[in-house]
């Protein structure tokens, strides 16, 4: 099943954490979940964010406000001159939701080690009619050179304008999808071409994560309860 499920969802609480962090009752849960999906869709549609190379959007709900943490490889594009763009983004989201919104930016230092950014880069080049084999080879080379231990890229659609759609895959290194302690990042993107859409999936393996290397905000793991020590009965002295 490791080959079928989403690698991030399979590792939640082990070495991955949730992108949305809040608590709600059964009555409000569905509405808040739908609101999170709308927030992420709005961010992708805002002109200031389309070319910002956004890797992840975290949503943290407080009693009085919503904090949106945007992970991007190009923070200057989102912030803008003297913070004009980030204020505009916050105003647009706040107007549509009717709630107080706080936008925070977190820079992604190494874009080659984030699967979402690799998928977006491949999709962008495919939309520009680049040779898909050359694009896949270059993406794998850049990722492995940056320190990854393995990468797998799969694209599907009318590749090169062919009449029949097909799937092509390229892999470098090892990607152990069945190993739960493996740090595997997953990303997906779509390339809009004149022939139709081409889907891009990326699996990126960065190494093993053991107990002491887990992220601080990851879900709490169950700890083994210590067994109470049983005291040995004192031996009676010889009379």
From Swiss-Prot:
Q: Could you give the subunit structure recorded for this chain?
A: Part of the 30S ribosomal subunit. Forms a tight complex with proteins S10 and S14.
Q: Which GO CC annotations does the UniProt entry carry?
A: cytosolic small ribosomal subunit
Cysteine disulfide links: none
| PANTHER family the UniProt entry points to | 30S/40S RIBOSOMAL PROTEIN S3, SMALL RIBOSOMAL SUBUNIT PROTEIN US3C
A Pfam family recorded for this sequence: KH_2
| Keyword check for rRNA-binding | yes
Matching Gene3D superfamilies, A to Z? 3.30.300.20, Ribosomal protein S3, C-terminal domain (3.30.1140.32)
- Record region (Disordered): 219-239
Family, according to the entry, reads as follows: Belongs to the universal ribosomal protein uS3 family.
KH type-2 domain mapped to chain residues: 39-109
**Which GO biological process entries does UniProt record here?**
translation
UniProt function note? Binds the lower part of the 30S subunit head. Binds mRNA in the 70S ribosome, positioning it for translation.
Q: Provide this UniProt record's keywords sorted from A to Z.
A: Ribonucleoprotein, Ribosomal protein, RNA-binding, rRNA-binding
Species source reads Treponema denticola (strain ATCC 35405 / DSM 14222 / CIP 103919 / JCM 8153 / KCTC 15104)
Q: What name appears for this protein in its UniProt entry? A: Small ribosomal subunit protein uS3
- Organism domain of life: Bacteria
Q: Say if the entry is tagged with keyword Manganese.
A: no
Q: Which molecular-function annotations from GO does this UniProt entry contain? A: mRNA binding; rRNA binding; structural constituent of ribosome
